[in-house]
Amino acid sequence: MLFYRFKSWYRLQAKKSPFIYVGLPFLSSVLLVWSCLIPISQVKFNRRDEQVKSLSRDAELDIIKRRRKVDVNEEYYRILLDQLNLQNEEYENKRVKRLKGEPTWEGNSSDKE
C-alpha cells in the first residue's frame, strides 16, 4: 500500500516539475555510470599500450617483413568472390513443373506433352 502511495505522489510531482523528478535522476545516473566506466576502460587501454611497448625490435621487423601489399581493387574482387562462393554453396537448382499453356523456350506448348 505504501508503494502505491509513493508511486502516485511521485507521478504527481513529476507532472509538476518533470526536470527535477525525471530528468535530474536520469542525468545523474548517466554521469555516475560514465564516471565508473572511464577507469575500467582506461585499464584496458593501459594494458594494450604496455603490450605494444614491450614488443621487441626484432618482432617489429618480423611483422614489417611479413606484411603483404594491399591493393584496393584486388581486395574488392577477393571479397566479392568470397561472397559469391558463399551464395553458390547455398544455391540448389530444382526443376519445377510448368503450368498448362505455359510456353517453353523451344516454342512448344506444354499442352502437347
From Swiss-Prot:
It holds the Pfam family COX16. It comes from the Eukaryota. It is found in: Mitochondrion inner membrane. It is a single-pass membrane protein. The chain crosses the membrane at residues 20-40. Residues 1-12 form a transit peptide. This is Cytochrome c oxidase assembly protein cox16, mitochondrial. GO terms for molecular function: copper chaperone activity. Its main location: mitochondrion. Keywords: Membrane, Mitochondrion, Mitochondrion inner membrane, Transit peptide, Transmembrane, Transmembrane helix. GO terms for cellular component: mitochondrial inner membrane; mitochondrion. Belongs to the COX16 family. The keyword Transmembrane applies. One of its GO terms (biological process) is mitochondrial cytochrome c oxidase assembly. It comes from Schizosaccharomyces pombe (strain 972 / ATCC 24843). Required for the assembly of the mitochondrial respiratory chain complex IV (CIV), also known as cytochrome c oxidase. May participate in merging the COX1 and COX2 assembly lines. The keyword Transmembrane applies.
